[in-house]
Amino acid sequence: MSKAIENKQVQVQEITEKFQNASSVVVVDYRGLNVAQVTELRKQLREAGVEFKVYKNTLTRRAAEAAGLEGINDVLVGPNAIAFSNEDVVAPAKIINEFAKKNEALEIKAGIIEGTISSVEDVKALAELPSREGLLSMLLSVLQAPVRNFALATKAVADQKEEQGA
């Protein structure tokens, strides 16, 4: 087997593993972005622990088929870059969506969330969700509300009794 074929097989295996291990994947068309813009996007994604790579479409298609994600092959046309996140499901969608708002040349094509192929609308909806910390703080405030209201009601009753007794 030639060295080139072996390298391609290794790349397909690498991409397949990334598809299988990633909690979320976002496929984008980066046509029209200059080098400085792509570098800025890579920097933002790297800071969030997201890997952003450009692979050949044929290798990506083979990897998607091996990972059982054949449905993503429809969008693998033209220059594509793929963002893989192993930890935070929301991070790649949020960063890329914000970047796409500022740079209209960046186009979100599709996503894979928890092993399920998602449309552009799904990826954008995911991007609009608050972060994990934000969701936890919302949950905490909802859980604290009854206790806080009870404490305020108790204090109001105590103040009222004090006024009547004075």
From Swiss-Prot:
GO MF term list: large ribosomal subunit rRNA binding; structural constituent of ribosome
Gene Ontology CC annotations of this record: large ribosomal subunit
Domain of life the protein comes from: Bacteria
Any single GO BP term: translation
Gene3D superfamilies on file: 3.30.70.1730, 6.10.250.290
Pfam families on file: Ribosomal_L10
Keywords attached to this entry: Ribonucleoprotein, Ribosomal protein, RNA-binding, rRNA-binding
Subunit structure: Part of the ribosomal stalk of the 50S ribosomal subunit. The N-terminus interacts with L11 and the large rRNA to form the base of the stalk. The C-terminus forms an elongated spine to which L12 dimers bind in a sequential fashion forming a multimeric L10(L12)X complex.
Family that this chain belongs to: Belongs to the universal ribosomal protein uL10 family.
Function: Forms part of the ribosomal stalk, playing a central role in the interaction of the ribosome with GTP-bound translation factors.
Protein name listed in UniProt: Large ribosomal subunit protein uL10
Organism: Lysinibacillus sphaericus (strain C3-41)
